[in-house]
């Protein structure tokens, strides 16, 4: 989920305190989980049959007679994901051994960390949260694989796409979010962003939205998954017309550059400079006109905290252009490395109808005069904490005629509204994003998959 560089918009942050109350990657669950146990069971049973025949023959003092052993049925069967995804991930991985992300060794001055015994021990002692992160990431991979195959097609409505993604995420976490507090255990990390063409971020369809995905559109698909507050944030761009391929390639390459450069003690300014150099080496030709791909200079990557999508008040931003500050990345931090490219000005502003909201963490007590605002704040606190939400999520909970109360919460400073961010009309924007963990001994690209 995008964070806009200050001062254009405040960071979207969520409070740990409020929420705490509450095979290969992407393919691993597609038929492999459970096979090993089943095969081992069958092998052991066959050996027992052979031994019984041999023992019987020896006791009789005669020749060994070959006995045709019956083939035992496997006790376990391959567990596969359904289409659409509805099998909880805990069923596919009963031992909670979820696929790890892409493991990248540190380089240069930090190369020693990979083999340093002290760092390896520290990593083992502090990796309890990895199970939650890896579960979130595997859910993201499986859901986006389904979306790419079945949902993201011309002619589909944005509402159908968003609800298809979100219903799948909830089903795989095993928490549908209809009971009070259930969404705080596991579910959506933030609303599904479906940002078309010049819209770069923070657009999700509200009730009654009639927008339909077209063949000539360039759409950014940005959604988050959390398990026990461990949020993974990952995004990709789809375009059906190959004329936009270079735009997508530029941004994907830039994101991978940012991931490669990121690491412990690395300065944000150095990462931003490398990202911009990579992205702006590309150009794209559309209808006979050549456009340079520009990095959107007021959008950034960001830290992710426990129930904190943008790291809270102590969060850090990862620029995608040169000239950033000298802040360094540190051991143990989690980052969303995301880059945005545009054929327009390379600068976004607020526009269009708001869909994204989040409760302000540590907000002061403000007297609310509207009873509807008081009731709505209670619903938000108990169901989302400070995780971002959208109007459709309130609709799911049966809330009605809540806009007046919601606007009152925004004007009172208790809830932040996050309008869509757009470049100039007629331009096209693209986004790619991954979540990375700066573990003591290695860097783990937790959301990496076969697709991007």
From Swiss-Prot:
Q: Which reaction does it catalyse?
A: Release of N-terminal amino acids, preferentially methionine, from peptides and arylamides
Name what cofactor the protein needs.
Co(2+); Zn(2+); Mn(2+); Fe(2+)
Chief location of this protein? cytoplasm
Annotated spans, Disordered: 1-96
The record's free-text note on cofactor binding = Binds 2 divalent metal cations per subunit. Has a high-affinity and a low affinity metal-binding site. The true nature of the physiological cofactor is under debate. The enzyme is active with cobalt, zinc, manganese or divalent iron ions. Most likely, methionine aminopeptidases function as mononuclear Fe(2+)-metalloproteases under physiological conditions, and the catalytically relevant metal-binding site has been assigned to the histidine-containing high-affinity site.
Q: Where is the composition biased (Acidic residues)?
A: 36-53
Recorded hits in PROSITE patterns, A to Z, give:
MAP_2
Molecular functions per Gene Ontology:
initiator methionyl aminopeptidase activity; metal ion binding; metalloaminopeptidase activity
One of the protein's GO biological processes? proteolysis
Q: Which InterPro entries match?
A: Creatinase/aminopeptidase-like, Met_Aminopeptidase_Type2, Pept_M24, Pept_M24_MAP, Pept_M24A_MAP2, Pept_M24A_MAP2_BS, WH-like_DNA-bd_sf, WH_DNA-bd_sf
Where, by residue number, does a divalent metal cation 1 bind?
Answer: 222, 233, 433
- Lineage: superkingdom: Eukaryota
Q: Which Enzyme Commission numbers does its entry carry?
A: 3.4.11.18
The record's Gene Ontology cellular component field reads: cytoplasm
From start to end residue, where is composition biased (Low complexity)? 18-35
Location comes to: Cytoplasm
Q: What Gene3D superfamilies has UniProt attached to this entry? A: Creatinase/methionine aminopeptidase superfamily (3.90.230.10), Winged helix-like DNA-binding domain superfamily/Winged helix DNA-binding domain (1.10.10.10)
Biased composition regions of type Basic residues, renumbered to the chain? 62-77
Tell me which residues bind substrate.
Answer: 202, 310
- Keyword terms: Aminopeptidase, Cytoplasm, Hydrolase, Metal-binding, Protease
Similarity remark: Belongs to the peptidase M24A family. Methionine aminopeptidase eukaryotic type 2 subfamily.
| Function of the protein | Cotranslationally removes the N-terminal methionine from nascent proteins. The N-terminal methionine is often cleaved when the second residue in the primary sequence is small and uncharged (Met-Ala-, Cys, Gly, Pro, Ser, Thr, or Val).
Please give the name of this protein: Methionine aminopeptidase 2
Q: Which organism is it from?
A: Coccidioides posadasii (strain C735)
């Amino acid at each position: 989920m995008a964070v806009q560089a200050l001062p254009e918009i405040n960071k979207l942050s969520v409070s740990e305190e409020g929420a705490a109350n509450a095979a290969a990657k992407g393919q691993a669950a597609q038929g492999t989980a459970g096979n090993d146990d089943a095969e081992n069971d069958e092998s052991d049973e066959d050996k027992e049959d052979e031994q019984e025949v041999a023992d019987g023959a020896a006791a009789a003092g005669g020749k060994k007679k070959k006995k045709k052993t019956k083939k035992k049925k496997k006790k376990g069967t391959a567990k596969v994901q359904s289409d659409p995804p509805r099998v909880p991930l805990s069923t596919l991985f009963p031992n909670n051994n979820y696929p790890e992300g892409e493991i990248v060794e540190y380089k240069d001055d930090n190369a020693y960390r990979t083999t340093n015994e002290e760092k390896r021990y520290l990593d083992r002692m502090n990796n309890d949260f990895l199970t939650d992160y890896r579960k979130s990431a595997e859910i993201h991979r499986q859901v986006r694989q389904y979306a790419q195959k079945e949902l993201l097609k011309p002619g589909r409505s944005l509402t159908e796409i968003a609800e298809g993604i979100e219903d799948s995420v909830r089903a795989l976490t095993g928490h549908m979010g209809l009971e009070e507090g259930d969404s705080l255990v596991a579910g959506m990390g933030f609303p599904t962003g479906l940002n078309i063409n010049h819209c770069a971020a923070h657009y999700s369809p509200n009730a009654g939205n009639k927008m339909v995905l077209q063949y000539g559109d360039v759409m950014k698909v940005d959604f988050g998954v959390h398990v026990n507050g461990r949020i993974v944030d990952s995004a990709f761009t789809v375009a059906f017309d190959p004329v936009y391929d270079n735009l997508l390639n530029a941004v994907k390459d830039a994101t991978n550059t940012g991931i490669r450069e990121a690491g412990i003690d690395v300065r944000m300014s150095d990462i931003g400079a490398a990202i911009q150099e990579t992205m702006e080496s590309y150009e794209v030709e559309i209808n006979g006109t050549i456009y340079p791909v520009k990095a959107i200079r007021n959008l950034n990557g960001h830290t992710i905290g426990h129930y904190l999508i943008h790291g809270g008040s102590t969060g850090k931003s990862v620029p995608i252009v040169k000239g950033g500050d000298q802040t360094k990345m540190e051991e143990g931090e989690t980052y969303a490395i995301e880059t945005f490219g545009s054929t327009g000005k390379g600068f976004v502003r607020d526009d269009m109808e708001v869909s994204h909201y989040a409760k302000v963490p540590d907000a002061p007590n403000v007297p609310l005069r509207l009873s509807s605002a008081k009731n709505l704040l209670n619903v938000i606190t108990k169901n989302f904490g400070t995780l971002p939400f959208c109007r459709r999520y309130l609709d799911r909970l049966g809330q009605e005629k809540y806009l007046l109360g919601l606007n009152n919460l925004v004007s009172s400073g208790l809830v932040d509204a996050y309008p869509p961010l757009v470049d100039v009309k007629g331009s096209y924007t693209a986004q790619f994003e991954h979540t990375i963990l700066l573990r003591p001994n290695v860097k783990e690209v937790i959301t990496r998959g076969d697709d991007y």
